[in-house]
């Protein structure tokens, strides 16, 4: 397995697909990376030369991926919570942040149903 940005990418898959195993790189970003590194998108990872892998690594190092990206998103959420913005309060309470209704659904964000006794009638 080739290692790029601290992630083992699968050898049997095409380079475009295997780059998406890195957190922060989707298909369009993977295509841009390969274009910058002058590597064909159709080649398999096992067929890449060391030179091509090195060029891909250099280009990926220019992007914010994996741990750095996760850290930045967590810090952004913490900052929202510290300044007590509306979004920060929603994060703190574990409710949907982007304006969704919560009367009926939002179970993923709120967690399992907490049954209240004698609610009927």
UniProtKB/Swiss-Prot annotation:
NCBIfam families: uS13_bact (TIGR03631). This is Small ribosomal subunit protein uS13. The keyword Repeat does not apply. PANTHER family: 30S RIBOSOMAL PROTEIN S13/40S RIBOSOMAL PROTEIN S18, SMALL RIBOSOMAL SUBUNIT PROTEIN US13M. InterPro entries: Rbsml_uS13_C (IPR027437), Ribosomal_uS13 (IPR001892), Ribosomal_uS13-like_H2TH (IPR010979), Ribosomal_uS13_bac-type (IPR019980), Ribosomal_uS13_CS (IPR018269). Keywords: Ribonucleoprotein, Ribosomal protein, RNA-binding, rRNA-binding, tRNA-binding. Residues 91-121 are annotated as: Disordered. GO terms for molecular function: rRNA binding; structural constituent of ribosome; tRNA binding. It comes from Staphylococcus aureus (strain NCTC 8325 / PS 47). Located at the top of the head of the 30S subunit, it contacts several helices of the 16S rRNA. In the 70S ribosome it contacts the 23S rRNA (bridge B1a) and protein L5 of the 50S subunit (bridge B1b), connecting the 2 subunits; these bridges are implicated in subunit movement. Contacts the tRNAs in the A and P-sites.
């Amino acid at each position: 397995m080739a290692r790029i940005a601290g992630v083992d990418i699968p050898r049997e898959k095409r380079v475009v697909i295997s780059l998406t195993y890195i957190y922060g790189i989707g298909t369009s970003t993977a295509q841009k990376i390969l274009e910058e590194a002058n590597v064909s998108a159709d080649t398999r990872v096992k067929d890449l030369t060391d030179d091509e892998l090195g060029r891909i690594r250099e280009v990926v190092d220019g992007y914010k991926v994996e741990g750095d990206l996760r850290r930045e998103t967590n810090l952004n959420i913490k900052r929202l919570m510290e300044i007590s913005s509306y979004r920060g309060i929603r994060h703190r309470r574990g409710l949907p942040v982007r304006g969704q209704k919560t009367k009926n659904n939002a179970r993923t964000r709120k967690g399992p149903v907490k049954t209240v006794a004698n609610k009927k009638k």
